[in-house]
Amino acid sequence: MKPAARHRARECAVQALYSWQLSQNDIADVEYQFLAEQDVKDVDVLYFRELLSGVATNSAYLDGLMKPYLSRLLEELGQVEKAVLRIALFELSKRSDVPYKVAINEAIELAKTFGAEDSHKFVNGVLDKAAPVIRPNKK
């Protein structure tokens, strides 16, 4: 699959996870509704589904990975930043085929696209500290 299709899968995953985090609806329902309502012809849909289910299933674990590196309480974190960080931490911890730098760079780009003005700096700061702990032998 082309890198652009993976990038689009991550973009869609941020949007769907944002919806899931706010609604607390079943992740399968969120996925179904998202795919029914969005144009996903240029999206790696399998990867989108993996990100959604992987983040939803492992959200407590992923939150635990980020907590030591947050400058505020998890509950105070914006929903977009939380979704972006969860995706990146899922890729770093569960998808060894995704290069370390790709996971971080994609998260920064997602934060620039969907987050508040300086959220990409915050996301970069958290991942810059967390990534070497999650993947100690990778750079």
Swiss-Prot record:
**Keyword Chloroplast on entry:** no
Task: Could you list this entry's UniProt keywords, alphabetically sorted.
Answer: RNA-binding, Transcription, Transcription antitermination, Transcription regulation
Entry annotated with the keyword Cell membrane:
no
**What biological process terms from GO does the record include?**
DNA-templated transcription termination; transcription antitermination
Write down a Pfam family by its short name: NusB
Q: GO cellular component terms?
A: cytosol
**A single Gene Ontology molecular function, please?**
RNA binding
The superkingdom of the source organism is Bacteria
Query: What role does this protein play?
Result: Involved in transcription antitermination. Required for transcription of ribosomal RNA (rRNA) genes. Binds specifically to the boxA antiterminator sequence of the ribosomal RNA (rrn) operons.
Q: Which family does it belong to?
A: Belongs to the NusB family.
Output this protein's name. Transcription antitermination protein NusB
